[in-house]
């Protein structure tokens, strides 16, 4: 290019061509820059083949015009919480009690006529936890909003009858059981991905995917809704990344080196928009199938693959351990102002084994 410009500069008769040539050079540079920096190159699908984190669009709540509301003014110089991290390095909120105004959020999502799907797997002996799960969900989960429960089970007749509130419904989705509890856990990703295509995309706006051997003890509402969220594991929220139980074997698709990692997310509470949940569950299932073909199983099964996915595709919100806690094992530390969704005491070996 420099030689071309020097040649043209040495020919006085070509002065009239200079503006046209400069224009063409600028056009080429602009088109090249667009190709490199185009937002399409930052989409999740391309990033799985590339090297940088996925960038997602915001929740679009700014499109809603709120009515007049009276509430305490947020104060720029007074942080809502001084004892915990409330935002990630990629500017995703970390949701703790005291960091949000639920009245504002309820109004925003109500005006959007949002429907939330809640998926839960009640396979084999785990069907025994379903009644308490559903009864407490009716008291605390997305109260005042439209909810669709999706119960995946191998025993449709054993699903209890629970009185549901207005705008709330339940669908029973019959699925097969697997011999090992690990396979039941891992196959959840495949089943959720399949039903995203078959039903969820046309029936709900957001999906929340949780474990069944739990109970809701306090408010769990629209403050969690976002394109993609994960939940901090109650056993690791104060730990360094070196202590996380990531999959450390390079042969696995879930492998994370010891010098990488933001947080350790648990597999029992994740979600987001249906489109994002479909991407997540499909990617995790495909990764597990590659591992299976290579004769390796990640240390914590689907949870290991979930952590790998959320490392490469940063969540747009992170839920604090308030949203899944085991009080029997961990007590109630002062940093948790509320225990919202807690483990039911049980003998793990008894419920996991036939």
UniProtKB/Swiss-Prot annotation:
Q: Where are the transmembrane segments?
A: 33-53
Give the Cytoplasmic membrane side ranges.
1-32
Q: Does the keyword Manganese apply?
A: yes
Ranges in the topological domain labelled Lumenal: 54-354
Heme as a keyword?
no
User: Of which family is this protein a member?
Assistant: Belongs to the glycosyltransferase 6 family.
Annotated protein name in UniProt: Histo-blood group ABO system transferase
Q: Which organism is it from?
A: Homo sapiens
